[in-house]
């Protein structure tokens, strides 16, 4: 069975900026790559004349096109609004649901330790909410049947993620060769 990798980002494009190179390589090697995008992209960009509904469609199309180039098996959207993510139990449950559905061996997401203001893109509130929520979803919630027992009714059994990697970190300690 192919190794499964889940890359989680707040917005359409986050996952590609952070990991498209290694994900493309791994997809070519036969690994199954899944993207989970938490927001719908309705406020993406500051210099456009599009309505939020138009932005949602544009950003979904762009994300799907990028995912196709990378070799992503599936792009999953939570559909939440840009700028409104909170590290709460609702977001954590949504993340646990997807983790239990996909059953990834590895997860990639934002670094929850990056709480210093070194750049706008790293300190975006949606990025911070996703970072904390992913960390909390993986341990202990995704692997513990007592968290979100309602997911068991739908057949979503607990799943233990074997490896967790953070991107957007101030202190990288691992590099992947994408040449």
Stretches found by the model and what they are:
Residues 1-103:
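Active-site rim/loop-helix segments in enzyme catalytic domains that contact anionic ligands
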């Amino acid at each position: 069975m192919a190794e499964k990798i889940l890359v989680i980002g707040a917005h359409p494009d986050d996952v590609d900026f952070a990991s498209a190179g290694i994900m493309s390589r791994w997809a070519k090697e036969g690994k199954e790559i899944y993207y989970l995008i938490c927001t719908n992209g309705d406020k993406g960009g500051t210099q456009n004349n599009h309505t939020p509904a138009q932005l949602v469609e544009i950003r979904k199309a762009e994300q799907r096109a990028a995912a196709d180039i990378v070799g992503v098996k599936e792009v999953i959207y939570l559909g939440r609004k840009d700028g409104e993510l909170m590290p709460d139990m609702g977001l954590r449950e949504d993340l646990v649901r997807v983790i239990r559905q996909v059953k990834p061996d590895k997860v990639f997401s934002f670094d929850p330790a990056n709480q210093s203001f070194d750049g706008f893109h790293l300190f975006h509130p949606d990025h911070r909410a996703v970072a904390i929520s992913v960390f909390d979803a993986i341990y202990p919630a995704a692997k513990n049947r007592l968290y979100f027992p309602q997911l068991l009714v739908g057949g979503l059994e607990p799943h233990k993620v074997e490896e967790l990697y953070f991107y957007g970190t101030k202190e990288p300690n691992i590099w992947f060769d994408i040449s």
